[in-house]
Amino acid sequence: MSVLFISDLHLEAERPDITRAFLSFLDERARRAEALYILGDFFEAWIGDDGMDAFQRSIAQSLRQVADGGTRIYLMHGNRDFLIGKAFCREAGCTLLPDPSVIDLYGEPVLLMHGDSLCTRDEAYMRLRRWLRNPLTLWVLRHLPLATRHKLARKLRKESRAQTRMKAVDIIDVTPEEVPRVMRGHGVRTLIHGHTHRPAEHPLDIDGQPARRIVLGDWDRQGWALEIDANGHRQAPFPL
C-alpha cells in the first residue's frame, strides 16, 4: 500500500471541475491507499465550522466514506482554511494535523508543512499571518456573525490576489535559508509542503548530508498527487 499527499485544491462550488476530479481521486486512488495527507488550502475559503454550506458538507461526507473504508485521512491548515476545526474533522472522519508535523514514513522521519511559514521574505504576509493565527484573533473571528466573516473572507482573498500579482517571484516563494534551518531543527532530511504552487523536487545539502524538499502541485489547470511507498515516490499531474 502507499501514502498519498495533496494540497492546494482550493475547493469551491464555483469550480465543479476540480470537485469532480477530487471525487474521482478519492474513489480511484485514496480508497486503495494506507493514508491520505491534505497539506492545506483544501478549501478556497473557510469561515468556520458553524458556517459549513451544502457543498462543504458534501465534501466532508465523501471523505468520511473513504475513511470508513480504512484509509487514514490527515488534514493540515492552509492560509485559506485555517478556521477548519474539530466539527468538520469529526464529520469528515479525518485528523487535524499541526503545522509543522513530523511523521514516520517507512522508517524515515519526514517533515510536513503547508509551506506559507517558509516565505519569510514576504514580510507583509508574515505579519498578517501572525495576526490571523493569534489565539485572540481566532477567538474573535469565530464569534463574528457569519455574514461579517463571509465579507472579510472575500476581502482578504481579493487583497491576496492583488498583492501576489504585484510581488516579485522570489518574495512569494520560500526563503532558501529558512528551509535548511527548519529541517535541521526537526532533525529531518525530507520536507514535503505545498502553498507555492510550484511542484518540484529540490535536492539539498544539510550539514554535508543529502536532503530533499518536495513541493506539491496545486489543482487549477490539472490535479497533482505525490504517492510514496516502500519502493520510492512519484509526483505526477493528471487532467481535471
Curated annotation (Swiss-Prot):
EC number, as in UniProt: 3.6.1.54
Protein keywords: Cell inner membrane, Cell membrane, Hydrolase, Lipid A biosynthesis, Lipid biosynthesis, Lipid metabolism, Manganese, Membrane, Metal-binding
Residues reported in the UniProt entry to bind Mn(2+) 1: D8, H10, D41, H197
Binding residues annotated for substrate, in chain numbering: 79-80, 122, 157-167, 195
GO cellular component, one term: cytoplasm
CDD domains: MPP_YbbF-LpxH
Gene3D superfamilies on file: 3.60.21.10
Stretch forming the signal peptide: none
Reaction catalysis annotation: UDP-2-N,3-O-bis[(3R)-3-hydroxytetradecanoyl]-alpha-D-glucosamine + H2O = 2-N,3-O-bis[(3R)-3-hydroxytetradecanoyl]-alpha-D-glucosaminyl 1-phosphate + UMP + 2 H(+)
Record localization: Cell inner membrane
Enzyme class, first EC level, given as a word: hydrolase
InterPro entries xref list: Calcineurin-like_PHP_ApaH, LpxH-like, Metallo-depent_PP-like, UDP-diacylglucosamine_Hdrlase
Pathway: Glycolipid biosynthesis; lipid IV(A) biosynthesis; lipid IV(A) from (3R)-3-hydroxytetradecanoyl-[acyl-carrier-protein] and UDP-N-acetyl-alpha-D-glucosamine: step 4/6
Name of a matching Pfam family: Metallophos
Cofactor: record remark: Binds 2 Mn(2+) ions per subunit in a binuclear metal center.
Molecular function GO labels: glycolipid binding; manganese ion binding; UDP-2,3-diacylglucosamine hydrolase activity
Cofactor(s) needed: Mn(2+)
Membrane topology summary: Peripheral membrane protein
GO annotation, biological process: lipid A biosynthetic process
Residues given in the record as Mn(2+) 2 binding sites: D41, N79, H114, H195
Similarity-based family: Belongs to the LpxH family.
Classification via PANTHER family: UDP-2,3-DIACYLGLUCOSAMINE HYDROLASE (PTHR34990:SF1), UDP-2,3-DIACYLGLUCOSAMINE HYDROLASE-RELATED (PTHR34990)
Role played: Hydrolyzes the pyrophosphate bond of UDP-2,3-diacylglucosamine to yield 2,3-diacylglucosamine 1-phosphate (lipid X) and UMP by catalyzing the attack of water at the alpha-P atom. Involved in the biosynthesis of lipid A, a phosphorylated glycolipid that anchors the lipopolysaccharide to the outer membrane of the cell. Can functionally complement lpxH deficiency in E.coli.
Domain comment as written in the entry: Consists of two domains: a catalytic domain homologous to metallophosphoesterases (MPEs) and a helical insertion domain (HI domain) inserted in the middle of the catalytic domain.
Protein name (database record): UDP-2,3-diacylglucosamine hydrolase
Source organism of the structure: Pseudomonas aeruginosa (strain ATCC 15692 / DSM 22644 / CIP 104116 / JCM 14847 / LMG 12228 / 1C / PRS 101 / PAO1)
